[in-house]
Amino acid sequence: MSGEDRGAPYRYAGERPPAYPADGYASYQRGLKSSIPSRSYDTAYPEQGYDRHLRERVHPAYTTGPSYGVPPPPPTDYRRPPPQAAYRYEEDYHHRRAPAQPHLEYAPEHRRQPVHSDAYREADDRRSFEQARSDPYASPSRHAYQDSYRSELPHERRHAPAAYERISVRDDARSAPENRHIDEPAVYRRDEYDAHSREIQPSYRRGAHRSPRLSPQPVVSAHERSSEYATRDYSASAARYAEPVHQPESPPRPSMSIFNMLNDRSANGAVESVHSSPTKSSIAAEHESYPTTAQEPSHASRAAFDPAREQSYSTARDSQAYSRGSEARAGAARVNYTVHPEDEAAISQRRNSSAHQQSSIKSVRHPANAVDEPLIRVKHEEATSASLDAQMSAEPPVSHTLNNGERLSAQDAKVATEDSSLAANGNGKVDSAGGTARPAPAKTQLKLRNNPLPASKSNSSFVAPPPPAKKNRDPDGWESDLSNEENQPFWQTELDDYIFDVRERQRLIEDAFVASMREKHVEVERRLARAYEGRYFAVIRQIRLREQQEASQRDMERRQDHVRQQRDHEIDLELLGTLSDGQQNMGTRKKKGGRGTDDDGLLQADDDDDDDSDDVALADLAARNGSKSNIIKLKRSKGKPAAADPRNKKRRLENGAALSPAPGSEVDSTLADFGGNFDGDDSAFASHQASPTPDDVSFALDVDASGKVPIDARRAQQLEDAHRRIWTTIAKRDVPKVYRTVLQSASSKTMYWRRISSVVQREAKRGAARNNKTVKDVQLRARKVMREVLVFWKRNEKEERELRKKAEREALEKAKKEEEMREAKRQARKLNFLISQTELYSHFVGSKLKTAEAEESEETAGSSKIIDPNAQPSDATVLPINPHSELADAEARLAELDDIDFDDEDESNLRAHAARNAQEAVRLAKEKAQAFDVAAAEERRRNEAAAREREGLDAGPVKQIEEKDLGKAFDSDDMNFLNPTSMGQTEIKQPKMLTCQLKEYQLKGLNWLANLYEQGINGILADEMGLGKTVQSISLMAYLAEVHDIWGPFLVIAPASTLHNWQQEISKFVPTLKALPYWGNVKDRAVLRKFWNRKQISYNRDAPFHVLVTSYQLVVSDEKYFQRVKWQYMILDEAQAIKSSSSIRWKTLLGFNCRNRLLLTGTPVQNSMQELWALLHFIMPSLFDSHDEFSEWFSKDIESHAEQKGTLNEHQLRRLHMILKPFMLRRIKKNVQNELGDKIEIDVFCDLSARQKMLYRGLRANISVAELMDRATSNDEAGLKSLMNLVMQFRKVCNHPELFERADVRAPFALADFARSGSLAREGDLLNLPDSTTSLIELQVPKLLVREGGIFDIPGHNSRKGFDTGYLQNLFNIWRAPHIHESLQEERSTFASLPLIGVSPSEAQKTFHSTGIKRILAAAAEERHWRSLEAFASDDTFAAASVRPLAKMLRPMPTTSGRSPSVLMPLEEVAADYRRHSYLAKDSARAVVAPAVAPPIKLYSNDGPFMQAQERFSRDAQVSVTLFGLSPEGRESVKRVEELQSELPEVPPQGVMRDSSIDQLPYNGMQVPQMNKLIVDSSKLAKLDVLLRELKANGHRVLIYFQMTRMIDLMEEYLIYRQYKYLRLDGASKISDRRDMVTDWQTKPELFIFLLSTRAGGLGINLTAADTVIFYDHDWNPSNDSQAMDRAHRLGQTKQVTVYRLITKGTIDERIVRLARNKKEVQDIVVGTKAYSETGMAKPQEIVSLLLDDDELAESMLRKKQAEEAQTAQEKADLARASHAKRRLNKDRAAAAVESPAPVGSTWSLEDDEDDFFGARPPSKADTDTAETTPQLQSKKRSVGGGGGGSGGAKRGRISEVASPRMTPLSLDDGALMASGEQLASPSKGAAAKRKSKSHRKKTVDELAGVDLD
C-alpha cells in the first residue's frame, strides 16, 4: 500500500536526489545535482515480472545489469515513475510479520542459491552506518529489498521522528496496487543477538530513552555536518517509550548513534565485531520489534547496529523456512562473519593505511586492479536465496573528481568524505595523512558517584544501569558530573577508543564495500554473459531451424521423385513378369488396403492414384523421424476434388509438421539447451523434430545368363491373373473414370470456348462502341438539353403562378383590411348612435329628475373641473352632443327621416334617429307606467266594489274620485319631454306618517326617488354605506301611500342577515305600513303565502300587508308564487348580489312583473364593467340591451388602463358619467354627513413565525415559476382552479399553521376496560368513577402456583418475609430508635436530617414499620397541621414559632431570583417549587409518549383465598376512601362523614389526592396542546393578542372579520382561553339567531368581541355599538371589506371608528391588500373623478402576481419575452438563410449555364473526367447514400459503373426504366431536394441536401439522362 493509502506520509518538499544503481539505494551528495533520472525497479529490470497477488518480485533465472562499472544504456521501459520516500511509524507494524516469499520456496535449486554481492553488502553497511549515525532508533525500511527509494537529506534524516521509518511510495497507481501493505516480521530475538550489547560501554548508559526529536534545520556545510555531533543537545528524551523494568536508575545518555553501534559491535566479540558486515544488521534491525517489559535489560536497546541480527534477517528472509512461517524464521540461519585466513594480511595492511581507501575506490571502476584486494567471505550456515542487493535497480553512478583526476562514484565519494570528516573529528588521534592510527589505550570503567553499575548478565565487560529520571543539564548538553574537568580522565580514554573504533569501522565498511562491488561485478558479468549467450544461440537456433526446414524440403522432394520412379519401375517389372512372389503379394496387400511392416506399409492408396507417391514420401519421412502415429491419411476422391468427396475424412499432413525437427533429435536437444538457459525467449518451436535421413532403396532381381528373367508356369499364371485383374480393373474402374474425364474435358472446353467467344464479342463491341461514341454522346446531350429546357420552363411557370397567387393574395388582404376598416367605422357609427341615443334619453330624464342637484357632493360637482368638456376627443370618439340642438333638428326633420345607414359618413341622419328613438323610449316608459297604474287602479276598484257589495255600500262616487285623481296625477301634458325641466321644480316634503326626521340629503334623495316613480324610470341609489339608504326607501313607500294612495304591494329583497333589520325599521319608522316577513321553512312560508296570494285583495290602508320582506334565496326558490303578483315597487337591498348577468337570480328577478325597480348598493361597481352593465340592464333593458356594445365602448379602455397598458380616454369617461347620472344617485359620507365621526385605517404588519416560515418556504419550493406562467397564459379552467388552490394554501399559512393540521391531544392507546353506566341522565349531574379501569387480560393461574409454597409465595423486594423471627426486625434493622439515637451522636450521621424536619427517632421507627397508607395519612395530617399554624409559626412573637422545625424556618436572604428577590424559601419547599415552576418538571416537557398503557393483568385462579387476597389488594375500600375520599353523595351525608372520621380521623372527606399538588400526581400520559403555542405559532394571532389587551383596557368594543370559518373556530378557542366574552355570526347562523345576536350586541355592553365572516356579517346589519374593526384577513374584493367596516361606521355612530388590518409582511397577504386597494378606486372612474380602475380576480395573470414577488414576476416575464424574441429572431434568420441560399442557387445556376461550353456536333466526347453541359459532375452511388449526411469530396476518377464500389466487370450503358433518385441542381426548388418519382426530402435534412447540391461535380451523360449504369 502506498503512502497515500496508509495515512499521512512525510514527503520531501524539495528536489529528491536520484537513486543510484550501485546498491539499489540512494545516497545524498551535498551540492550534487545529477542529470541521470531515477528509475524504478521495473525500469531497471524490465524483463522481471511483478506478482501483484504475492506482492513480491518474481526473480528470473538470470537478469541483465551493469558490468565492469560501465553504466548500461537507459532502458525504454518507463512504466513506473521514480519512487518517493516517506516515513512510517514502526510501532504500527509491531504485530505484523515479514511477508512470505513463496516464489523462493518453490523456486528451482539454482535460483535458491545465496548470491550475496560484496558491493551490495558494502552499500548496506554504509546505509546502515548512516542511519545509525543519524538516529540509532530509526530502523531502515522493511521493504527496501522490494523497491528502490531515495534517501533524505542528512539533517532531515537526523532530525526525523524516532519512530519513523521510510518506505517507497510510488506515484503510479499501477505500480502500487491498493491491496499492497507493509508487513511486519514476527517478534523474534535470540540471546546471541544481545550478548554483545554491553561490551564497550562509555561512561553513560544506554537506555530506552530516545534523543529529542528536533524540527528540520537548514542544510549546513560539510564541516558543520561532520562536527555537529559534538554540539548536539542531548538534554531531552522521548517520553513515548517506556523505560525498561530492570533499569530504574541509570543516568540519561546522549543520543550518539555511533556509540550504540560500536557497543553492539563490540558486544558480539572481537573477531566478529571487527569483521562482521553491517549489511545484514540494518535489515535485521528493521525487522526487530521492540522488546517487551519481560525481557532482560540487555534487550532494551533494539535499534543499535547489530551485524548478527542483520545477517540473521537476511538469511532467514532468503530461506525456505522463513517463507513458511515466523516459527521457522526465528532460528532460520546463523551467520558467522569471519575473516578468511588468506585475507587477514590484506585486511591488516589496509587497516594501517588510510591511503588504501582511494585505491579501493579505484577498484570499483577498474576491477582488474583490485584482484589482489582481500575479500571478506561470509560463511553461511544455511543456503539462502539471492540477496536484496541483487534485486535493486542498476543506475549509472555519479562520479566525483579526486585530486589526481580520477572519477569516483557517488557512493565512494561519500564514503571518502565521511572518512575524512570522521578522521578530522578524532582530536588528533588519527594521522592527518590517513596513516596508521594510534592503538587504543586500555578501557577504563567510569565510576559514577550516584549509581554504580550492576553486573551484566552477558559476556560484556560491564553492564550499564538503567537511566534515571530526567535531570537538568548544562548548556553544552552534557550532564554536570561528566562534563566537569575532574571526570575528564574517565571518559577521555573511551573517547579515544571511540575514535579508533570509528576508523576501524570505516575501514571495515570500505573493505566490505570493495568486496561487495567486486562480487557484484562478477555476478553481473556472469549474468550478462549468460544473457548474451542465450540471445546469440536464439539467433543461431532460428538459423539452424530455417536450414533444417530447407533441407527437409529438398529431401522430401527427392524422396517423392524416388518413390515415383520406384513405383513406375515396379509396374514395368510386373507387366514384364519380373516381379517376385513376395513383392507381388506385398503389392496385392497394398492394393487391398493392408498395411506393410516397412515404412511404406503405413500408407494406403489406390493403384491408380496419382498422389500416392506423396503419401508414401510422407509416411517414409514420418517413419524415419519416429512420428508414425502423427500421420493422417488423406484419401482423394476418384475424378473429383478432395473437398467435394464425402469419403475424404482425413486431411493431408501439413507441410510444417514435416519441416520441424523431431523431438529428441540432436538439433532439438541442442536448441533445448538454450531454452533452459534463456527463459525470456518464447519460441514458436515448442517441440522439434529430427532431420530426415536419406532414403536408400535397392532392387535385387534374378536373371539368367542371357539377361532375361526366367518365368515358370506358376509365374506365368500369376502374370496372366495379374493381367486379367489389371484389365478388369481398367474396364470396371478406369474406363468409366476416363470417360467421365473426357466428358468433363469436353464440357470444360465448350465452356471455355464460349467464354472466349463472349470476351471476343465484348471486345469487338467495345471497339465498335468506341467508334460510335460521338454519335451516342450527341443523342444523350440533346436529350439532356431537352430535359433541362423542360425543367426550366416548368420552374418558370411555377414562379409565375406563385407570383400571380401572391398578387391575388395581397389584393384579397388589402380588400379585407379595407372591409375591416369600413366595418370598424360602421360599428363605431352604430355604437355612437346607441350612445347618443342613450345620452339623449339620460338628458331628457335627468332634466326632470334633477339628479345633479340631489347629489350635492364635491365629487360630482367637481367633475367638470377635472374633465375638460371642451377637450377634443380621440379618433374613436364623437363630439359631445348638444341635446337642445339635436332635439330641435329632430323635430324639424321628424317627418323626412331616411332609413338608418351606418355606412353613410354623414351622421346627421343618425343623430336625428337617435333623438327620435330617445323620445320614443321616454314615451314608451311613460305609457308602460300609465298602463300599469290604470290596470292597478282598475283592479283595486273592482276589489273594493266587490268588498262594498258584500258590505252593502255604493261604489259609484268612489270610482269617480279615483278616476279624477288619476287624471290629475298622470296628466299627459305634464310629461312633455320637449320641456324636460317642467316637473323637476316640485319640492316634496317629508311624509307625515314617517316617524323619523329625514336629513337634508335624505330628503333630496326622496325627491329623486319620487321623480323616478312618477317618470316610470328605474334607478340605483348608490349612497355610501351608512347614509340611510334603507330609511330613504321606506320614506318613498310612505310618500306613495300618503300622497298617491298607493299602499302596495311593495317587495323588498335583502340578504338574510338584514331581513330582521328591514322588518324592524319599517315597523319603527312607518307603523302604518304592514310588513310581512317571508322566511322560514316550507310550511311556514306556505302559511305566509295565504296573506298575499288571495285573489281578491285590495291594497289599501286596511290590506293584510303592504310590504313583503324576503331574501334572495327564497325569491329564487318560490319564483312561481312571486310572479303572480303585480308589484308596485321592487326594492333590492345590497344589489351587488345580482351583479352577474348569467346567474339564475338575475334572470329570475328580471322576469318579475313590477312597475318600478330600485337598486340599493353601496358599491355599484365592484370588480368589472360587466357588473355595472348587469345593473344598468336590470333597470333599463331597452337601452342597455347589448353587453358587447357596452363593453366595446367602455370596458376595454378602462380595464386596459387598470392593467397599466394605456391611458384612459377622458371623453369616454365623461360620456359614461353622462349616461349613468340620470339613473344613479351616489353621495359619500364626508360630503353630506358632517356629524359622523372620522374613520381611521391602520395597517399592522406582522412577521412570519418560525413555523409559518417553514411552511411558506416549503410551498414556495414546490412551485414552478415556468408552470405558473404557462397556467397564467392559458385559459384552462382546471389551471385557474389550481392557481386559486395555491392562493388559498398560502393564505392559510399566513393566517395560522393550525389550518393545515391541528395539534390534537396526544394520548397513548389505553388497553383497559372502563366503567359504564346505563344512562347519564339517570346518574344525575355528578358521576364519580375513581379507580374504574380494569385490564382486558385475565391470566388463569393453577392452584399449585398460588397455594403455600407456590411461586406467588416467593419473597419480593417489598416482602416482609423473615421479620417474623425477630432477627431481621431487631438485630439487622437500622431504623430502630436506639440505633438512630446512637447514630445522631456521630459527626456524619445518616439520620442527621431528622431533626431538621422535626421527626424523633421513635417517630422514624414507627413510620418505617407502618404501612404505606398510614404514612400517607400521617404526612397529610402533618401538612394540614402546619398549614393551620403557618401564619403563627412564621412570626416569632407567637408561641407556635417555638415548635416549628428547622426545615420550616424562613431567613431573609438576598437572592437573584425574580420571583422571590429577598426571601430564601424553606428547605422542604424547594422540590415543590421546582415542580411548580420548572418547565422541565411539567408533563408538557415530556418528549416521548408511551404508545400504549394498560392496568396490571388480572390474575384468576380456582383458589378462593387467592382471589379474595387479589380483590383486597386491588379493591381495598380503606385505601380508596383515603385517596379519593367519599362520593359526592357521601360528602353530603353527615352520618357517612362521621363514620369516616371515626374510622380514619386523619382523612378529609374529599380524600388526600384532592389536597395534593398537581405535580405530585402520577403522569397520565396525555399531552394537551398548550394555548400559548396556539398563539405563538401565528404572528397575526400573537399581534392580535397584544392589541386586544390594549383595547380591553381602554373600554373599546371590537368587530373582527374573517374570510375562513375554520379560523373563526381557532379564534373561539383563543377567546375562551383569554376569557373574553364574544359573539359569532357566519354563514351557518340562522336568521333568527342573527337578529338576536345583533340585538344583544347593541344592548349588552359587556360583550367585548363580535366574530363575523366578511361575506355574511358585512351586509346591512347595524353594529354601531362597536368603535373598532379588525380585519384578520382580507378580501380581494374591496367592496366586501368596505361594507364590513361600515357596519360600525354608519349613522348612529358617535365615536371615532378605528380600522386595523393585520398584514403579514412579504407574503401573499400584503399583495392581496395592495391589489384590493387598486380595485377600490374603480368607483371613482365609474361614479367619481379619479382616473384609475380595478381588475377582476378571474384573470390568471393576477393570481400569478399574488403567488410571485415583483422581482420574480418581472424576471419570469423578461425571460419569457427574451425567449419569444429569440424564437422570432431565429425564424427570421432561418428565413433569411433560406432566401439567401435560394439566391445563391439561382446565381450558381446562371453562372453554370453561362460558363458551360456549347455543344459542337461530333466533337463532343464525354470522358470520366470531363465536365457535363453545365459544368457539374453527376453524383455517385456513394453520394446518393450519403446525401442526407455531411457532404464528402468525390474523387475525379471513378469506375465506369458509376460508383466507387463497383466492380471492373460491371456492365455499362444499360438504361434503367426508373430515373435516378439523385436529381440535378436544376431540379432543386426553394432549397428542397426533389427526386423524379421519389418523395420530398425531410425538412430536417434539407439543409444538408442543399449544401450538397452546391458542389460542382462532373456528371456523366447517362446520369444526366436519368439512366442507371450497372
Swiss-Prot record:
ATP binds at D1023, E1024, M1025, G1026, L1027, G1028, K1029, T1030. It comes from the Eukaryota. Residues 599-611 have a biased composition (Acidic residues). It catalyses: ATP + H2O = ADP + phosphate + H(+). Its EC number is 3.6.4.-. GO terms for cellular component: Ino80 complex. Residues 1010-1182 form the Helicase ATP-binding domain. Residues 726-851 form the DBINO domain. Residues 69-84 have a biased composition (Pro residues). PROSITE patterns: DBINO, HELICASE_ATP_BIND_1, HELICASE_CTER. Pfam families: DBINO, Helicase_C, SNF2-rel_dom. One of its GO terms (biological process) is DNA repair. One of its GO terms (molecular function) is ATP-dependent chromatin remodeler activity. CDD domains: DEXQc_INO80 (cd18002), SF2_C_SNF (cd18793). Residues 1583-1747 form the Helicase C-terminal domain. Residues 257-266, 311-320, 349-362 have a biased composition (Polar residues). Component of the INO80 chromatin-remodeling complex. Belongs to the SNF2/RAD54 helicase family. The DBINO region is involved in binding to DNA. This is Chromatin-remodeling ATPase INO80. The lineage of its organism: Eukaryota, Fungi, Dikarya, Basidiomycota, Ustilaginomycotina. The gene is INO80.
